[in-house]
Amino acid sequence: MDIFLRSISGILVILGMILVGFVIGEKGWFDDKSRGLLAKLVTQVALPCYMLYTITQRFTAADLLKMLPALRFPALSMVILLGIATGVARIFAVRQDRRGLFISMFFNSNTIFVGLPINQALFGDASIPYVLIYYMCNTTFFWTLGTYLIQRDGEGEAQFDLKTSLKKVFSPPLMGFLLGLVMVMLQIKLPAFLASDLQYLGNLTTPLSMIFIGLSVSHVGVKQLVLGKDQLLILLGRFLVAPLLMASIVYWLPLPSLMKQVFIIQSAMPVMTNAPVVARLYGADSDYAAVMVTETTLATMVVIPFLMLLMA
């Protein structure tokens, strides 16, 4: 019960910040352009600083070398989820013009905008390396296979562009993580003033991310949130199939309990915030993607405490 109450407390912290974003969104403080600016501040400024500061200040080379082989667990989970999603889309006759988007949302999760703050709230900073390991896998899958599938919905015969995909995979947050990794391995220390700058900027990550989520919920509108077949299947995939699959992969293995818990929580995160953006770019069903981002984000706040209780 103590774990359940602690997880409820962590979720309430997150919900409070989301509520702030929702309220100012309803008041019309942010238009599409300013929402995009907020997302850029998080992904291109706050998150890279957060990654670089956290890795260089809190981990040793030995710590990181022990963790990197764990990449195989989220990778295996996502490959299996991709197969399951493809089968589910065919069995339940998901519309052809949104099938690729459906598959992408089924097997990819929002590991940074939502995953990082939630894991921090539940487990503290010790969870960050495991969060980043899952993120590395997730972002690679989304900007390669996921984007290809969404593009196929909008353009029919999609073409895979390796150069564009690599630019997306090696995003500023991942580059911040990799730079931190190199500095730790080479035992390069940050000057104190620079470390402080990175810490201040990095601390913007969680509040700005949650305010952005609240703004997104306001933008979609509560009236748009419906539970049709295609919506329910995504909810089941994100919050039942994905965590059960990850749990079945890691449960029996001699891994740190924190790693297992973080991987399971990360697998049960909502649909990626980038999904509607990519869908709009390629002429796919961006409204469906936006609704699913909102519905799964709200559902996460209910699901996570019960997941924590089960893992205890």
Feature map (PLM): residue ranges:
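Alpha-helical transmembrane segments of multi-pass small-molecule/ion transporters
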Residues: 1-312
